[in-house]
Design a protein with these regions (language model features):
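A conserved beta-strand element that flanks and buttresses the S-adenosyl-L-methionine
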Residues: 137-142, 146
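S-adenosyl-L-methionine-dependent methyltransferase catalytic module, highlighting the catalytic core
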Residues: 65-68, 145-245
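Class I SAM-dependent methyltransferase Rossmann-like catalytic core
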Residues: 20-86
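Boundary detector for helix-to-coil junctions that initiate low-complexity/charged tails
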Residues: 1-19
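Glycine-rich SAM-binding Motif I of class I
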Residues: 75, 100-102
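Adenosine-cofactor binding site in Rossmann-like domains, unifying the SAM/SAH pocket
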Residues: 102-138, 151, 157-161
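Conserved class I S-adenosyl-L-methionine
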Residues: 86-99
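Hydrophobic/aromatic residues located in beta-strands of well-ordered beta-sheets
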Residues: 92, 107, 176-178
Length: 245
């Protein structure tokens, strides 16, 4: 699929996509959040959230105004996985160029559309490589697959194909870890609800305040709407997949 199939290619396309997914109200609010960011962030109280028995600090950055969206927890989650991998001298691939916007990293990055130094512009389902990875990590990328493009075919099948492709690139003891928001992509939500995503392990985070997230049981997170009551994601799934047998 060529880049013109991407719904948010170009400035006009990106504005149209943003309004379609998040509403015109967010189009109005976003510039004010960006302008206010350098004033607001220094005064924000440090917060933490629990994940797998430990505490991780929320992450506030001006880029993408992480202090008012799910990146506040997704970036720390991504860094947690990278730290685990670094302790084991693991080979890492990130699918979707996200963490590079918030600091320097030396792992491989694959992104179908975003051009940046060192980023491999390939589709994960067709990428040919002899390399195998201990960890494949993806931050809020899989919900866009088949949903934010004009290519024919259902999103669910494409998401499952991308998961299968990632798992096939893992070393025997490797794992794929992804974060996805609930309530954004209806087909992805149905996969999760029906236990058809195929994850081996999963953890759910629910937003209880503008910058307050808590790990909750599956039934507490399912059905959480996107964009209400707080902007953007109000619940996340962190899913892990093992290498195929």
């Amino acid at each position: 699929m060529e880049s013109e199939d991407h719904l948010y290619s170009g400035v006009i396309g990106r504005v149209q996509w943003f309004a379609r997914r998040f509403g015109w109200g967010e189009i109005v609010c976003l510039p004010f959040r960006i302008l206010a960011s350098r004033i607001v962030v220094p005064f924000l109280r440090e917060r933490h959230f629990k994940f797998r028995g430990g505490l991780l600090p929320c992450f506030y950055a001006h880029y993408n105004v992480t202090w008012c969206n799910e990146r506040a927890v997704e970036v720390p989650l991504g860094r947690w996985y990278l730290e685990q991998a670094a302790e084991e001298a693991a080979r890492v691939l990130e699918v979707g160029h996200v963490l590079g916007h918030y600091g320097d990293h030396d792992h491989a990055v694959l992104d179908k559309y975003e051009t940046a130094s060192g980023v491999i512009n390939e589709d994960i389902t067709t990428w040919q490589t002899e390399e195998r990875f201990d960890l494949i990590l993806s931050i809020s990328t899989f919900e866009h697959i088949g949903f934010d493009d004009d290519a024919p075919g259902g999103s669910a099948d494409k998401i499952l194909a991308a998961i299968a492709a990632c798992r096939n690139l893992l070393k025997p003891q490797g794992r794929l870890a992804i974060t996805v928001p609930l309530g954004y992509n209806p087909e992805l939500d149905r996969l999760i609800e029906r236990n058809e995503l195929g994850e081996d392990r999963g953890w759910f985070l629910l937003r209880h305040g503008p910058r307050e997230w808590k790990e909750v049981a599956r039934h507490q997170a399912m059905g959480t709407p996107f964009g209400r009551p707080f902007p953007f994601a109000n619940a996340l799934l962190v899913a892990e997949f093992d290498a195929p047998n």
